[in-house]
Regions:
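Short gly/ser/thr-rich secondary-structure transition/capping motifs
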Residues: 43-49, 103, 124-126, 242, ...
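Short beta-strand segments enriched in small/hydrophobic residues
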Residues: 18-21, 56-70, 179-197
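Conserved acidic
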Residues: 25, 29, 51, 70, ...
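Bacterial carbohydrate/catabolite-sensing allosteric modules
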Residues: 43, 84-89, 137-144, 148-353
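N-terminal helix-turn-helix DNA-binding module of bacterial transcription factors
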Residues: 1-59, 352
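Alpha-helical recognition/docking segments in bacterial nutrient-uptake
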Residues: 3-4, 58-174, 254
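A general structural signal for well-ordered alpha-helical segments in protein cores
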Residues: 5, 16, 34, 52, ...
Length: 353
């Protein structure tokens, strides 16, 4: 009798759900538990059964999610939503991290494990052309996150950066802010393969440019002036947010409103300002972007532009499933833009600034 996932879970002494999450590389499983599950799978030859399944049906039922890093809560939350959607569709999600390395990303996509996948969802570090991706994944379907590669033949899913940024800036203005700054740098992808002279941008770059354009229109200034006068240039994590808070205070707190390009930056800023005795929102109002779970429980709670991650996951799985199940049906590449919701909370509450 073939070994089942339930058998592996029983051997490892974990629940069916935990076993499935561990085998798929999801972030909510401890390293110790993951090691125990993998050992049980190996002992029971569970991978062999996967190979047999492929021989029978020519499909593994696996979707590979290639992501820069699971440390940002945004990607962790997205992976959970993707796993839920994949399971509902009778598929399994495998998550692999490139650690922001273009070379590692290419290696992962072309690896033996990835060769088992029926399709790919890639949050890219490198800036691929159609030919690049085709060489790595062959004729398998792929969905690209964002609009910053040179691909034209693959489906893509993206969040509306310009619309989300504009809603955040408009919210700060409605709450009484007269001088608004941007917090966050262009990119954390230190090894990103950006062609010389290219106008192609990473997710960070797209959001950054949208913010610069919004403030340039608001203050009738050019981008260079915005960068020089209204940008606190830091990385996209909470430690850098704390550093941004210090830079903001050292510069004399020139803004009464701050738009952080990412919630993790904003949460770091809230902590740094609180430690220094700066009152939010009384002295400065802060809004983030993404809608990660911690934004609702910080002190003060963080206003944010929440991305529809369940909708994104649903779109990704639907696009992949259609192409996996109907490989001979030629359809034009689809682009799905998911929605956002502005969550107004305590960090931008109206009052004196």
């Amino acid at each position: 009798m073939a070994t089942t996932l339930k058998d592996v879970a029983r051997q490892a002494g974990v629940s069916h759900t935990t076993c499935s999450a561990a085998l798929r590389g999801l972030p909510n499983v401890s390293p110790r538990t993951r090691k125990k599950v993998l050992a049980a799978a190996q002992a029971l030859h569970y991978n062999t059964n996967l190979s047999a399944r492929m021989l029978r049906s020519n499909h593994s039922g696996l979707i590979s999610f290639v992501v820069p890093d699971l440390s940002p809560t945004y990607y962790s939350m997205l992976s959970v939503e993707l796993a839920r959607e994949a399971t509902s569709a009778g598929m399994q999600l495998v998550v692999q991290q490139s650690q922001h390395s273009a070379s590692e990303e290419s290696s992962i996509i072309g690896s033996a494990l990835s060769s088992l996948a029926d399709g790919f969802f890639v949050a890219p570090v490198a800036h691929y052309t159609d030919e690049d991706l085709s060489m790595l994944i062959g004729d398998k379907p792929a969905v690209i996150l964002g609009d910053f590669t040179q691909t034209t033949q693959y489906d893509r899913v993206e969040s509306p950066n310009s619309e989300g940024v504009n809603s955040a800036i408009q919210h700060l203005r409605q709450q009484g802010c007269t001088s608004i700054g941007i917090v966050g740098g262009m990119t954390d992808d230190k090894e990103a393969d950006i062609p010389e002279g290219s106008s192609i941008l990473t997710l960070q770059g797209l959001r950054m440019h949208a913010a610069m354009d919004a403030l340039a229109d608001l203050y009738h200034e050019n981008r260079e002036s915005i960068v020089n006068e209204r940008l606190i240039d830091v990385g996209w994590n909470s430690d850098e947010g704390i550093r941004a808070a210090n830079l903001f205070m050292e510069s004399g707190m020139p803004y009464d409103g701050l738009f952080c390009l990412d919630d993790e930056i904003a949460l770091g800023m809230l902590h740094g300002l609180h430690e220094a005795g700066v009152r939010v929102p009384e002295q400065v109002k802060i809004i983030g972007f993404n809608g990660i779970r911690h934004s609702a429980i910080s002190t003060p709670t963080l206003s944010t532009v929440e991305v529809d991650l369940p909708g994104m996951a649903s779109a990704v799985v639907s696009l992949l499933r259609r192409r996996i199940e109907h490989p001979d049906v030629e359809t034009l590449p689809q682009k799905v833009t998911v929605g956002t919701i502005l969550r107004a909370r305590e960090s931008t509450a109206a009052g004196n600034v």
